[in-house]
């Protein structure tokens, strides 16, 4: 048995418009801005979700230059957020807010449905519904 327990804490997103990006997670996915600070010369906004997960959004720091998204890269492809409640109603609401669906809701096994949406700055977010 390990001496420590590891659990997921946050996803960190770098954006040219940190406030707009944080607002997107609040308006589209129901997050809540917990705090907004400046660290190393760049805004950093903490957006929490009901299960304790956090998306931290920050801007470019002085002297940094973001390359932007290019072709497929090794590393993180997307992050997933579990939906509890009415998955279809959430998808309908996201469409009314002009959220781009990268993959429509799809049944991937008898207990799981997923879809992919595009967040600001080309970030891919998987929404999943699991029926236990």
Residue ranges of each PLM-predicted region?
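Acidic/polar helix N-cap motif
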Residues: 17, 85-86
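Conserved active-site tyrosine of GNAT-family acetyltransferases
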Residues: 21, 25-26, 94, 122
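Vicinal oxygen chelate
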Residues: 1-7, 32-82, 91-118, 131-132
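Short glycine-/small-residue motifs
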Residues: 127
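Conserved A-loop
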Residues: 12
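Conserved beta-strand-loop-alpha-helix junction that forms the acyl-donor binding cleft
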Residues: 15-18, 41
């Amino acid at each position: 048995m390990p001496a420590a327990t590891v659990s997921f804490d946050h996803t960190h997103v770098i954006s040219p418009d940190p406030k707009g990006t944080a607002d997107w997670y609040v308006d589209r996915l129901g997050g809540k801005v917990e705090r907004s600070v400046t660290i190393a010369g760049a805004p950093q906004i903490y957006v929490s979700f009901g299960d304790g997960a956090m998306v931290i959004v920050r801007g470019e720091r002085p002297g940094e230059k973001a390359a932007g998204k290019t072709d497929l890269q090794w590393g993180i492809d997307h992050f997933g957020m579990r939906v509890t409640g009415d998955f279809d109603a959430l998808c309908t609401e996201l469409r009314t807010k002009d959220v781009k669906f990268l993959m429509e809701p799809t049944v991937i096994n008898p207990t799981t449905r997923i879809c992919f949406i595009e967040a600001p700055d080309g970030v891919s977010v998987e929404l999943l519904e699991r029926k236990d």
